[in-house]
Amino acid sequence: MEIIMQTAQYIIELLKAVFLGIVEGITEWLPISSTGHLILVNEFLNLRQSKDFIDMFNIVIQLGAILAVMVIYFKRLNPFQPGKTAREVQLTWKLWLKVVIACIPSAFFGLLLDDWMEAHLSNFFVVAIMLVVYGIAFIWIEDRNRRVDPKVTDLARMSYKTAFYIGLFQVLSIIPGTSRSGATILGGIIVGTSRSVAADFTFFLGIPTMFGYSGLKAVKYFIDGNTLTGGQAAILLVASVTAFLVSLFVIRFLMNYIKKHDFTVFGKYRIVLGIIVLFYGAVKLIFG
C-alpha cells in the first residue's frame, strides 16, 4: 500500500512538472515574466521539493524553451548551413557578434548582483510592482510608437551600438517580475527597432543568456552541497521537454501576432496580474 501511495505521489509530481513546463513555455516568450509566473504557480501547485531545488528548477527549465528557438531558427543562426551564400554567412556571423555584444551587460551585472537580487527581491511585492510598472510602460510606449516609424526594420541593418543598448535593457530582467523578453522587446522598441526585429533579437539573445544563467544556477546548486535524485532529474527533464514543445508553438504564435497587433494587450494583462499578485501577497503576509 505504501508503494502505491509513493508511486501516486510521484506521478502527481510529474504532472505538476508538466504544468510548470507549459507555464514556462508560454510565459518565457510572451512579455509577461516567466519566473514571476513560475513562482506564483508553484505557490499553489506546491512542488514537494526543497527550496534550493525549486529555485534551480525555475531557471534550468528555461533550457527547454531556448532549445525551441534553436530548432525554429537553426538555418538562420547556423553560419555553416549548406546553401548559404558568402554574404549570408557574413551576416550570420555579424548577427552572432551583435548577440555577444548585447550579452556583455547582463553577464557582468548578473554575476555581480544575482545572489543579492535573489536574497532581497524574490518576493511577491517586487514581482507585483514590476508586473505593473512594465505593463504601464508597454501601454505608454506602444501608444507613442503609433506616431513614430521604426528606424530599424531589418535585423541585418541593426547596429552594434543598438544591440548593446538592448543588452542594457536585458539587465533589468534580473529583477523578478520584469520578464527578460519584455525588457528586451521594450528596449528594442525604445531604441528604434520594429516589433519583429525586437522580438527576433530577443529570441536570439536568449540563447547564450539562458544557457549561461541556467548553467550558473546549476553549478551554484551543486556547490552549495545539494544533490540531484533520480526523481528530481525526471521532474526537471519532463518540465524542460514540455517547455520545449510548448515554446515551438508560442514563438510562432507571437511572430504571427505582432505582424498585425502591438503589445498593449500584454501590458494590460501585466497590470491586472500585478494587482492580483499584490493582493495575494498582502493577504498571505497578514494571515500567514
Curated annotation (Swiss-Prot):
Keywords: Antibiotic resistance, Cell membrane, Cell shape, Cell wall biogenesis/degradation, Hydrolase, Membrane, Peptidoglycan synthesis, Transmembrane, Transmembrane helix. The lineage of its organism: Bacteria, Bacillati, Bacillota, Bacilli, Lactobacillales. It is found in: Cell membrane. GO terms for cellular component: plasma membrane. One of its GO terms (biological process) is response to antibiotic. Its EC number is 3.6.1.27. Its main location: membrane. It holds the Pfam family BacA. The keyword Ribosomal protein does not apply. Bacitracin is thought to be involved in the inhibition of peptidoglycan synthesis by sequestering undecaprenyl diphosphate, thereby reducing the pool of lipid carrier available. It is a multi-pass membrane protein. Catalyzes the dephosphorylation of undecaprenyl diphosphate (UPP). Confers resistance to bacitracin. Belongs to the UppP family. The keyword Isomerase does not apply. It is an enzyme of class 3 (hydrolase). The chain crosses the membrane at residues 25-45, 53-73, 93-113, 121-141, 171-191, 196-216, 231-251, 263-283. It comes from the Bacteria. One of its GO terms (molecular function) is undecaprenyl-diphosphatase activity. Coiled coil: none annotated. This is Undecaprenyl-diphosphatase. It catalyses: di-trans,octa-cis-undecaprenyl diphosphate + H2O = di-trans,octa-cis-undecaprenyl phosphate + phosphate + H(+). InterPro entries: UppP.
